[in-house]
Each structure stands twice: as C-alpha cells, then as structure tokens.
Swiss-Prot record:
Its cofactor is FAD. One of its GO terms (molecular function) is proline dehydrogenase activity. Pathway: Amino-acid degradation; L-proline degradation into L-glutamate; L-glutamate from L-proline: step 1/2. It catalyses: L-proline + a quinone = (S)-1-pyrroline-5-carboxylate + a quinol + H(+). GO terms for cellular component: mitochondrial matrix; mitochondrion. It holds the Pfam family Pro_dh. Keywords: Acetylation, FAD, Flavoprotein, Mitochondrion, Oxidoreductase, Proline metabolism, Transit peptide. This is Proline dehydrogenase 1, mitochondrial. The modification N6-acetyllysine is found at K368, K479.
C-alpha cells in the first residue's frame, strides 16, 4: 500500500481556476467603505416605500393559516416546552407506535409533530405547501431530512473508522494532528447535543454519491420553484470526514504559526486583518527554525505573490499554501507545544487520495448544477473540528462561481469566538480578488460538542452580541457593494428587528434582494410571513421524507423548542391570541386568501 504526501494541488485544482494569490494589481483595488462607490449596483429607480412590519399583528401574521393549523402549532409548541415530556419523548414514541400500529402512528404524527415540522414524504407531495407559502411571500429551501437509524454504538464505530487514516487504524503511525482534530470516542456520535441539523455518517463512496444525487434533486427543485431559489448542502455528506479533520488541522497550524511570528515581531493582540508581518524578519525566523532554506524562502516571497510593500498579512500568508504546491509536499512547521518540526500535510494512501478527489468532484458537480439552474448554494456549518476545512473549501468555490453574483454562501457560526475575525477576513479577500461575498449568519447548532480549549462564547447574550456585530459589518459592506448578499438565519425577533432597523438606516431596500431571512418550517411564522408579505425575501427550511425516517429530525425539533429557541413562549402567546380573536369574531373557518 503506497503512501503519498498529499499536496494542495488536489484541493485547489478541482475547486478553482487559478491559484490563490494576492497579486499587486488585486491589492490596489480600493476597499469598500464609507464614501466608496457601489460596485456594479443596480440603476437607481424610484422604489416603493417599505411597508412597516408588525410582528405582533396576529391577524396579518397568520392570515396564511387555517384555524386548525394554528391549534396544531399551539399544541405542538406547548408539548415541546414540557421538560418532563421531552425527557421521555423517545420512549413515548416507541410506545405509541407499539400500541397504535404503523398506519395509525403515521396518521397521528402527520396530524401533530410531523405535520408541524415536515412538509411531506417526497418532492411531489410537498409541492402544494411550497406553492402556498410562496403565494404569501415565503420561499423554500428544501432539505431531505432522512437520517440513518444508527444506534449510538454504531454511530461511534462508524465515526471512529471514517475519521482515522489507514495508518492510524492499522496502528502503524501516531497521529500528528492536534487534539481537536483527532478522532475521540467521546464525540463519536455527532448527533449528541445537536438540535437543528441533520447528521451524516460516512458509510461508503456509493453512499456519498447517493447524497450528492439527493442534493442535486433539491437544487433542481429549488430552481423550478422560483427565480431566486436557495439550496443547502453539508460537506460531511460528500466524503470521509478524515479529510476535513486533516485539512482543518493543517489550516489551523498554518494560521497559528503566523500569530506566533506576529508575537515575535511585537504585533500580538492586533485585529487579524490589521496584523502585518515584516517579510525580512519573517524570512530570518523561518530559516532559523529550519523550516526551509534561504533559497527556498526567497522563492516564496516575491513581488508577484505578495506585492512590493515588504509586509504580508494573514490573507497573504494563507495564500502561500496554494502557490507553493511543490514545496508544500515537504513543508514543516514547529509544533508550538513540543517545539519539534512536524509535517504540515499528512500522508494519504492512494485509495485515500482517490476518495479525497471524489469528494472535491462532488462539490464541483453541485456548484455547477446550482450555477446552471440559477440557485444560490449555501454550505452549512458543522462541528468546530471540521469548520476550518469546510470554510476554506467553500471559499475556493466562491472564487470560482461568485464572479458575477453571490452564488455560493459560506456559513458563519456566531457562537464561535473568532466569528467576527473570520467575517472580516472573507469580506476583505472578496474585495481584493473581485468576487461576490455571500454569507449566512447563524448562532450555531453545535454548542455542546467541544471538549478542548473552549472556542465558543460563554453565554447566549455574548453570542447575540457577536451575531449583531458580524451582521452590522456585513450590512455596512452591502451598502457600498451591491454584489454582496447575506442570509440572516435567525428565529430571534430582536435580531430581525435589528436587521430591519439597520437596513432602513443604510438605505438597503428589500427589492435589492441583498438581505435574506431564513427560519425553519413550523417555527416563527409570526416573523416569516409578515416579512414576506411586506416584500422582504424570506425563506423556510423545508424538510421532507417518510415519517419513520425523519423521526431523528423531529426529535431535535422538539428539543430545540424546549431550550434554544427563546421566542417559543411569545410564539405560543400570539397563536393563542389569534385563535381567541377568530373565535370572538366568528372567523374560525378562515380561509387563506
């Protein structure tokens, strides 16, 4: 079994047209900011005034819903708020299935939890709901919600095998990856603590191809449903998670080395985008550490790759991984904990290289299909130990496909401490290289899955502050760059109000379709539908699939309503208020129109 040192070529060749570099011409482009001219913005035309949005007007908020649907929502959300019920919900579901039989159990679920949170069993059966929501200004993001029914033990075993290299599994090598990028049994079942996302486990290359086909069907359906559709994918569905772990480890070490050298040059504590290293001093440090020879170093740092300023920032530094393909095969960096030099890139077998290539090809197929049918493709965020790789691979797709409009959207998890720095760096890179920035901002669904130095904010309030800070920065960018766009994926009413206020202050009109809103089906209709009816682009994540196969998804919906979604109590109050209003006005048989 031959071993190869993987090179960046495998990642870059399939994901982009040209090497990541920061040539002088690109650096001379003026950064967007106050006073800058909009980039390729739409012609100024008279636009209608933006209607006021009232989330407390239940008659308008729920005019798309029949009374029995409101009663179901009130019942389901109230049950989800019961800690005693939630603690035993799996046992209760099992008991109900045993007592009622499969057919009656399916009927009960469709009348309650399934009907609330899932659109239907297949793309044909969900079409009426999609068309109904669109008539009231709400689009759909299709999400095939089926998960494999694995026991915790099976999930743990599958994850441990798919996150380890052949050498590690055979006991022939010791992992050089840092702790957070190694496989740990304690986190083997990635479903634990995840409240709002479908989880994929690697089974085989054929299974990954099947996941790709499912994503392709969703992209095609979204393209046919509207002229401004969205679709979402997860990279863990497309290949072995081992590659994401190893790539994340490499990127993290490379970035950490940059900050180590910055500290040596007395520049610790500066914002990531403002930290600039003196190239001459950096060259001396690299030679002293034995990372490369002086001749190799001189070949690294040239005017062609870094400009003529004599300094380089974190974006320049990360670009060196791309442009130094041959040297990266032998690249080593010092382990800041042991002091020893270690290979930056891990060893792959020939079979592992083929699997990695197939993963990147699947990403490429999906991006091309989205581009072909005009659907925006959102790459969902996942666990922190996968996220550096996911973000970087998404960025490579953005370089290639976001040339004319923001087609590929990266996801930023604002519960992470470095979320704001990551947003700033990606916006700056898009400015330099001239592609369209696209982002989805979320608070985060993986807060319980850490186990090392805590990368998350300490409280929900701290996360909300970071979310608003990131959102405000992106909205400022949108004001000066008409080719950028953002999806505000939040159930938090205060966050949505904050967005609307800042849009008004910055002159961002909903007709420009730069700011999108997203919520889950069955949750926060009092936010989604008033926005849609007022002309704001808003979307529901619409899961679908057979009843029994989406039960894991439904379990997490129930858990989310109990804790994460703080607005559930207000939503129940509004539902009850509207039912009482209809009862008092004799309009219980209200028909949406």
């Amino acid at each position: 079994m031959g071993l190869r040192r993987t090179s960046w070529m495998h990642f870059s060749a399939l994901c982009r047209r040209a090497p990541l570099s920061t040539a002088p011409a690109a650096r001379e482009q003026p950064a967007a900011g106050p006073g800058a001219e909009p980039v390729c913005g739409p012609a100024e035309t008279a636009r209608p005034p933006v209607p006021a949005v009232d989330f407390g007007n239940t008659q308008e908020a729920y005019r798309s819903r029949r009374s029995w649907e409101l009663a179901r929502s009130l019942l389901v959300l109230s049950l989800c708020a019961s800690p005693a019920l939630l603690a035993r919900h799996e046992q209760l579901l099992h008991l109900a299935r045993k007592l009622l039989g499969q057919r009656l159990f399916n009927t009960l679920m469709k009348m309650t939890f399934y009907g609330q949170f899932v659109a239907g069993e297949d793309q044909e059966s969900i079409r009426p709901l999609i068309q109904h929501n669109r008539a009231f200004g709400v689009g759909s993001i299709l999400d095939y919600g089926v998960e494999e029914d694995l026991t915790p033990e099976e999930a743990e075993r599958t994850e441990m095998e798919s996150c380890s290299s052949a050498l590690e599994r055979d006991g022939c090598g010791v992992s050089k990856r840092e702790k957070q990028f190694q496989a740990h049994r304690a986190f083997g079942d990635r479903r634990d603590g995840v409240t709002s996302a479908r989880t994929y486990f690697y089974a085989s290359e054929a299974k990954c191809d099947s996941h790709m086909e499912t994503f392709l069907h969703c992209i095609e359906a979204s393209g046919g449903a509207s002229e401004d559709g969205f679709s979402a994918i997860k990279l863990t569905a497309l290949g072995r998670p081992q590659f994401l772990l190893q790539f994340s480890d490499m990127l993290t070490k490379w970035r950490r080395f940059f900050h180590h050298v910055a500290a040596e040059q007395g520049k610790a504590g500066l914002a990531a985008v403002d930290t600039k290293l003196e190239v001459a001093a950096l060259q001396e440090s690299v030679v002293k550490m034995g990372i490369a020879s002086r001749a190799e170093i001189e070949d690294w740092f040239t005017a062609e790759t870094l400009g003529v300023s004599g300094t380089l920032d974190l974006l320049d530094w990360c670009s060196l991984i791309d442009s130094r393909t041959e040297l990266s095969r032998h690249l080593v960096v010092p382990n800041m904990q042991t002091g020893r030099l270690e290979p930056l890139l891990s060893q792959f077998t020939e079979e592992e290289e083929r699997q990695m290539t197939r993963m990147l090809q699947r990403m490429d197929v999906l991006a091309k299909k989205a581009n072909q049918v005009g659907v925006r493709l959102m790459v969902d965020a996942e666990q922190t130990y996968f996220q550096p790789a996911i973000s970087r691979l998404t960025l490579e797709m953005q370089r290639r496909f976001n040339v004319e409009r923001p087609l590929i959207f990266n996801t930023f998890q604002c519960y992470l401490r470095d979320a704001y720095d990551n947003v700033i760096l990606d916006v700056e890179l898009a400015r330099r290289e001239g592609w369209c920035f696209g982002a989805k901002l979320v608070r985060g669904a993986y807060m319980a899955q850490v186990g090392y130095e805590d990368p998350i904010n300490p409280t929900y309030e701290a996360t909300s502050a970071v979310y608003h800070r990131c959102l405000d920065y992106v909205l400022e960018e949108l004001k000066h760059n008409a080719r950028a766009a953002v999806m505000v994926a939040s159930h938090n009413e205060d966050t949505v109000r904050f967005t609307l206020r800042r849009m008004e202050e910055l002159g961002l009109h909903p007709a420009d379709r730069q700011v999108y809103f997203g919520q889950l089906l069955g949750m926060c209709d009092h936010i989604s539908f008033p926005l849609g009816q007022a002309g704001f682009p808003v979307y529901k994540y619409v899961p679908y699939g057979p009843v029994m196969e989406v039960l894991p998804y439904l379990s997490r919906r129930a858990l989310e309503n109990s804790g994460v979604m703080k607005g559930a109590q207000r939503e129940r109050q509004l539902l009850w208020q509207e039912l009482k209003r209809r009862l008092c006005t004799r309009s219980l048989f209200h028909q949406p129109a």
